[in-house]
């Protein structure tokens, strides 16, 4: 019964936001509360919700100060030279801009953190999309697809969870996946080409100069004399993120404080800069805490466990020898409907144990489980996706509708490549 309620809750939630009946923020709060009450968990509801919000508090704090930090960097003109370089290359061609978005996203994604990837990519590319009148859903979609493929690098979250859950080594899981990952990269570039070609057909090639657009209000905020300082500060921040020098919220809080103090030493200026980015920060962070309500109820009611076991039980014994392929396919809905932690620590060991009865190595199941990551990033349970849509200025539901077929296509392409090369067996 819990499993059925869990699936119905997810379906209702998806319908409400994709049909624009409710905003994602309201749906994340109201829908799980209603279903928890129907399930008879009214007495424990408060504790579940607070636990969910508490679990996501560090993420919310990190995103708040990350938005403020990169907002200061944009105001100061840190990304202006990069935008000028990109402009000189793309020459007002939407196709080149779309492909450039894919390449930039996947390059930055090497740091293993989706938040910084979206921050830098959107900060660099959004002005170009605005100047040419390109569809921002193309920007958000390509950025998410690129991040989805690169999300399986060893220092990213999913692969680390697989290694910990199944007690495996990087050489057993990630190294064999590299050819499939390359296939995914080529697919994302191909998708960017297709979407860019559509935008070129709609808009044409537009003649623009090679300098970032001049906004009279933005000019006084530029800090060309501090360009190198801001660049070094950002590089140091990225290095600290990769090496986990300090917790992410602390790193972004510290970097923001230093950036604001150096670039805008006047207290009134500091207040204006914070106010200028407060709206964007509020939109994203409120969504994260609302997602905490959703995940808290999903976990606290044990709906997520019931959903996992019911899905695993649907796999017939006759399909046992094909578990690697089945795992690759079901990793899409599994990681969409539940968090990576729930899937990789709760469901994956069960699948791996079942596969061992058919002589299938746990490493093969681990590799297969990572192929659904491009779809996972469309889940309402992924905080960084709210940052992406917030910065790009698109609705969560529209982003899902626009990107879902391309995300599923990414998983299919990577799975076919994995089968052909022998990374996973049929």
UniProtKB/Swiss-Prot annotation:
GO terms for molecular function: citrate transmembrane transporter activity; symporter activity; transmembrane transporter activity. The keyword Cell membrane applies. Signal peptide: none annotated. InterPro entries: Cit_transptr-like_dom, Citrate_transporter. GO terms for biological process: citrate metabolic process; transmembrane transport. It is a multi-pass membrane protein. Keywords: Cell membrane, Citrate utilization, Membrane, Symport, Transmembrane, Transmembrane helix, Transport. The chain crosses the membrane at residues 1-21, 22-42, 59-79, 86-106, 137-157, 176-196, 232-252, 278-298, 318-338, 343-363, 377-397, 406-426. Its main location: membrane. It is found in: Cell membrane. Disulfide bonds: none annotated. Transports the free citrate anion. Probably cotransports citrate and at least three or four protons. The citrate uptake is inhibited by the presence of magnesium ions. Belongs to the CitM (TC 2.A.11) transporter family. This is Citrate transporter. It comes from Bacillus subtilis (strain 168).
């Amino acid at each position: 019964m819990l499993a059925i309620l869990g699936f119905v809750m997810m379906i209702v939630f998806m319908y409400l936001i994709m049909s624009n009946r409710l905003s994602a923020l309201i749906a994340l709060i109201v829908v799980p509360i209603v279903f928890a009450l129907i399930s008879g968990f009214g007495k424990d509801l408060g504790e579940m919700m607070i636990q969910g919000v508490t679990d996501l508090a560090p993420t919310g704090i990190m995103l708040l100060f990350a938005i403020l930090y990169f907002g200061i960097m944009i105001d100061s003109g840190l990304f202006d030279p990069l935008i000028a370089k990109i402009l000189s290359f793309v020459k007002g061609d939407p196709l080149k801009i779309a492909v450039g978005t894919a390449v930039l996203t996947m390059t930055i994604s090497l740091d293993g953190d989706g938040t910084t990837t979206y921050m830098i990519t959107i900060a660099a590319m959004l002005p170009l999309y605005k100047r040419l009148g390109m569809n921002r859903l193309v920007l958000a979609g390509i950025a998410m697809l690129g991040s989805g493929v690169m999300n399986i690098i060893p220092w990213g979250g999913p692969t680390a969870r697989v290694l910990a859950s199944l007690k495996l080594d990087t050489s057993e899981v990630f190294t064999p996946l590299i050819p499939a990952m390359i296939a995914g990269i080529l697919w994302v570039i191909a998708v960017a080409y297709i979407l860019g070609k559509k935008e070129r057909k709609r808009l044409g090639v537009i003649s623009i100069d090679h300098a970032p657009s001049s906004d009279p209000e933005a000019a006084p905020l530029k800090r060309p004399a501090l360009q190198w300082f801001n660049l070094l500060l950002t590089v140091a921040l990225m290095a600290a993120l990769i090496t986990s020098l300090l917790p992410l919220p602390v790193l972004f809080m510290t970097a923001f404080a230093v950036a604001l103090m150096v670039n805008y030493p006047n207290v009134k200026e500091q207040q204006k800069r914070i106010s200028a980015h407060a709206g964007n920060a509020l939109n994203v962070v409120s969504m994260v805490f609302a997602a905490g309500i959703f995940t808290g109820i999903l976990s606290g009611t044990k709906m997520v466990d019931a959903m996992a076991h019911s899905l695993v039980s649907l796999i017939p014994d006759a399909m046992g020898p094909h578990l690697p392929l089945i795992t690759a396919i079901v990793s899409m809905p599994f990681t969409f409907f539940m968090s990576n932690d729930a899937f990789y620590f709760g469901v994956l060991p069960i699948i791996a144990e079942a596969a061992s009865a058919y002589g299938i190595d746990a490493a093969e199941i681990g590799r297969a489980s990572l192929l659904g990551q491009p779809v996972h990033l469309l889940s309402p349970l992924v905080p960084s996706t709210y940052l992406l849509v917030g910065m790009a200025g698109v609705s969560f539901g529209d982003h899902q509708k626009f990107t879902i077929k391309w995300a599923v296509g990414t998983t299919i392409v990577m799975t076919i490549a994995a089968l052909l090369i022998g990374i996973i067996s049929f």
